[in-house]
């Protein structure tokens, strides 16, 4: 997904620069589908020798109308209107409708997980398909092993450069994709003249006829191959916030025409050569003159790399959103560029690299990868349709319109899903297993948070103000820090997590001039940055609610610096004069952040399922990042404390003092 978030005022505008940005960011996946989609369709029919005119016309017609109904109607005309403060994607859509039904978190988790799983296979199939074009260059192509090695080298380079950001090469994405789509359109138009009867495919009759025709050897399951042409449609919606609605509205017609011309050109070539026997045919490269193949392989490889980069960046964004929505554990996130939205997650990058490389080694050829492709993304689209239905209800769309749109989309996408199920035994089970693993982690993380919130005990801080005030003046204790800051996940007005007061008063009394209690609330809006302060009628207790959008960095110290300045300037917080400082006139004291981690106690009192969830979460936490880096505390003084998560009053265990017994025989002997 993209690297540039457009200003609100330009969201609905289209510009030439925005047009190029959209080409480079949004359409990589769907724009490289001509590399392999028609190849999969022909292979499913048993090869070029088994193709008839009606089959070719029907297949191209299915392609055209799939692009029209799924990409144009669902995503461009409907989904793009479901923006969350100009942001798109399945998690942005979920935040719009999650208050309507609690169970809507289920399609959000399933859709997000399958989209992530699909993101691991897309780079493998696109780059492999591009490199396989060398089969037509006999003096260069040696064998499939060479293709695999070349693909692995390209993918390794692509994943290795992620830590440096993509801003430098990203500027080339738009112009390269403009050349790519221009080539698709021009070459497709030229090849269409091989047999102009291919234009009949615009008529949907041929698409419907093919589904029920005895000439269609794959039958209904041909839809599994047809769906490959629109797998990138979900990315179009996900990148809404990075390019703007206006630029997508203007660029999609250009992209769609070029893609359709490419498929028509391939179809016309198939019509002109039907009945021939050609081994391992890929119509995309077969239509080219021999002296052009090497150049097109280079161009298609660049397009495949750009498509892969978009999927990788999109995976980073998707994971970061899931973390902020408490659907995934914390991972270390870096921001290698200066542009908003540009991020890098090492753990996700490594997982994608390993998984993508595994797919290349396991499937070996693009033909085998295609057989496993698209099942996961059909599930994502069905989940998006579910959430879209509730969005339309929320917006007050007429019921008849909702029924037509929802039933129509469920029928179409349900058909593609059913047709793709046959791919399960052809390798799609691996992608499904990856998606299930992600769903499992999401479920554990989300459910465990709810369980902990249920058991956490809260105390009224008003009842402890006198103790805190006495402690801050009690010179028998060393000054722990001028300002002590506690991050808490549960704070409701004057009620605060018991473990925090336990840490201040019981574990080791922490004398400070000011006690801060900070709670970060993730808002449904993507780029909110607001705060609310309650001094609790004191000048030494500060309750801070930080309201941050689900795409904002949660760097607490940087926000606190602004809040402290605001409070001191307004007179609500006394200035903390520093006698020793390299900063003349410094009025703010030192800070120590205390991160309290609660450890499960007396777990046997908990129901078995809840105990399993919390214990599983504890195991997952061992391999994930700590809150220190997530909250931007790595350059601050931090103390991490472990306190018990008490489910109920701990029952004292019975025990009796053992009294010394005097041996009777020994007692008699002494007398």
From Swiss-Prot:
InterPro entries, per database record: K+_transporter, K_trans_C, K_trans_N, Kup
GO MF entry, a single one: symporter activity
GO CC, one annotated term: plasma membrane
Record's keyword terms, sorted: Cell membrane, Ion transport, Membrane, Potassium, Potassium transport, Symport, Transmembrane, Transmembrane helix, Transport
Record's subcellular location: Cell membrane
Keyword match Ion transport: yes
Source species, domain of life: Bacteria
Any matching Pfam family: K_trans_C
Transmembrane segments: 18-38, 60-80, 103-123, 146-166, 173-193, 218-238, 252-272, 292-312, 343-363, 373-393, 402-422, 424-444
Coiled-coil segments on the chain, per record: none
Keyword rRNA processing: no
Catalytic activity, reaction form: K(+)(in) + H(+)(in) = K(+)(out) + H(+)(out)
Entry membrane topology: Multi-pass membrane protein
Role description: Transport of potassium into the cell. Likely operates as a K(+):H(+) symporter.
Cited PANTHER family: K+ POTASSIUM TRANSPORTER, OSMOTIC STRESS POTASSIUM TRANSPORTER
Family to which the UniProt record says this protein belongs: Belongs to the HAK/KUP transporter (TC 2.A.72) family.
Protein name: Probable potassium transport system protein Kup 2
Source organism of this protein record: Lactococcus lactis subsp. lactis (strain IL1403) (Streptococcus lactis)
